[in-house]
Structures are given as structure tokens and as C-alpha cells.
């Protein structure tokens, strides 16, 4: 099979259907009535005159080692949902229950920023735009290694060895780790972002339209890479996209979002 062709996974189920062979006690993520409302301000004193209901009562679950596709048109609240789950935005209301590696269930909405920090090792995000999500003043080594330094996982020679391994895992030559993002193509930049996401061995990944900014031929390569890594590492993934033809190749179930609701 050509590397520019996506691997077929067969038919997918919609979000309300139960995956075969799964038990109800293996949820890794359960979202209940999640709301994310942004204030609308007007006038000299910038008083709140209303709210934009970007996410308005969204509920779904995600099982261990499952890929759930969250699809919908632009502006429907998909990305905001993903960012709210990871607490990049503080949700207005609702519950986001996450089962940690030790089996403990915790409502992410109710914990503090300090309590959230260790969870960021288990919950990671792949950003949509490989051009703006990478710091142009940092080398690839620094970009991929930054999470390892922040969480005090590795430094020095061990850090370089880990970065080299991560680059190899995503199909990049480790000899290029001293280069800067502008020296890579769009597909290669997305692979750099993927390596950064995988650096802390996460259990849950929110992939925010990871191929929408890429050429069609490159999309297939990145999708196949995501599928291979998911199968090899046993990852759980919320895959956000606006194109059903993309999600059908990697997702087990699909949730369709429209004007802030599923």
C-alpha cells in the first residue's frame, strides 16, 4: 500500500452506540453536560451584555484505547470542547471525569491549576496548525524536549537520547534536531508536534484537526502514522475534524456537533 493512501478501518459507529467487546467500567473520560460560555462585552465600561454559547451541554464518553471522532462544521464548538476538557479553558459548567493511571476518577472541572499540572503528563493535545504551534526561535530538540524539562523527566544526554527516539518514532531524522521549524515542511512540522505530544507517554490525546492544514497527499501519511502509534502505544484519542472522510479511517465511533451541541 502506498504511504499516501490511508488504511481502511471499516464502518464506524456513532457516539451513542456501544463498541463491541467493551464493558461500561472502562471509561477513561466521561463528559457530562459540559458548557463553555464566553461573555459578550459592549460599551465604554465593557459591560457583559450576553454570552456566546460555544459549548452548550455536551455529553459523551471515551473508552480505554478507543478513538472517538468529534466532527462538525467550522465554529460549532469542537475545538473549544477539546480545550475545555484539557482545562486550556476553564469550563463554565459541567463535569469532566478522567480516570487516572492509578484508577482514581477525578472531575477535572473542579480541581485547581496546581492539581491539574501532573495530569498534563497523561493528557496531551495535538494542535491544528503546525506553523503557529511551534516556537520559531526554538530548535526541534528544545521543542520536543521542553515538556520533559518542565516535568523534570530528563535532562542533558538523556534528554537528547529521548528526543532522538521520539523523532525516529514519528519518521524524522534525529540528525535534524538542531534545526528550526521553518526548515521543515508542513507535514514534518506536524510530526514534530506529534513527537512533542508523545514525549510524556500520555494515555489520552486530544487531536485538534491534526491534518486539516496539510496537503491531501501528506494527510494520508500523518493519518497512517497516528494509527500506527495509537495501535503500538495503546492510546486513547479524541479526534476532532470537520471531514467525515478523514475520521472514518481512524475512529471507532463518531459524535456529530452542531452549534455547541452533540
Model-derived features: positions:
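P-loop NTP-binding/switch modules centered on Walker-like glycine-rich loops
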Residues: 73, 210, 214, 218-262
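ABC-family P-loop ATPase nucleotide-binding domain
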Residues: 1-51
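Conserved ABC ATPase signature
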Residues: 180-184, 188
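ABC ATPase NBD Q-loop/coupling interface
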Residues: 95-118, 155
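Hydrophobic anchor residue at the start of the ABC signature
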Residues: 194, 206, 222
Amino acid at each position: 500500500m502506498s504511504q499516501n493512501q490511508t488504511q481502511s478501518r471499516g464502518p464506524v459507529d456513532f457516539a451513542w452506540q456501544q463498541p463491541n467487546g467493551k464493558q461500561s467500567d472502562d471509561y477513561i473520560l466521561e463528559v457530562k453536560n459540559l458548557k463553555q460560555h464566553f461573555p459578550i462585552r459592549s460599551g465604554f465600561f465593557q459591560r457583559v451584555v450576553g454570552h456566546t454559547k460555544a459549548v452548550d451541554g455536551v455529553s459523551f464518553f471515551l473508552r480505554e484505547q478507543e478513538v472517538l471522532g468529534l466532527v462538525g462544521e467550522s465554529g460549532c464548538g469542537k475545538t473549544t470542547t477539546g480545550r475545555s476538557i484539557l482545562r486550556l479553558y476553564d469550563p463554565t459548567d459541567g463535569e469532566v471525569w478522567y480516570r487516572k493511571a492509578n484508577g482514581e476518577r477525578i472531575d477535572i472541572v473542579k480541581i485547581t491549576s496546581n492539581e491539574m499540572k501532573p495530569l498534563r503528563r497523561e493528557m496531551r493535545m495535538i494542535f491544528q496548525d503546525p506553523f503557529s504551534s511551534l516556537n520559531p526561535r526554538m530548535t526541534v530538540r528544545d521543542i520536543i524536549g521542553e515538556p520533559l524539562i518542565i516535568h523534570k523527566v530528563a535532562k542533558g544526554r538523556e534528554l537528547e537520547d529521548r528526543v532522538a527516539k521520539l523523532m525516529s518514532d514519528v519518521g524524522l531524522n534525529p540528525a535534524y534536531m538542531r534545526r528550526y521549524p521553518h526548515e521543515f515542511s508542513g507535514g514534518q512540522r506536524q510530526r514534530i508536534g506529534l513527537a512533542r505530544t508523545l514525549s510524556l507517554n500520555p494515555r489520552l490525546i486530544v487531536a485538534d484537526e491534526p491534518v486539516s492544514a496539510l496537503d491531501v497527499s501528506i494527510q494520508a501519511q500523518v493519518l497512517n502514522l497516528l494509527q500506527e502509534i495509537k495501535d503500538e502505544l495503546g492510546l486513547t484519542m479524541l479526534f476532532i475534524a470537520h471531514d467525515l472522510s478523514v475520521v472514518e479511517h481512524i475512529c471507532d465511533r463518531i459524535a456529530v456537533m452542531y452549534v455547541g451541541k452533540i
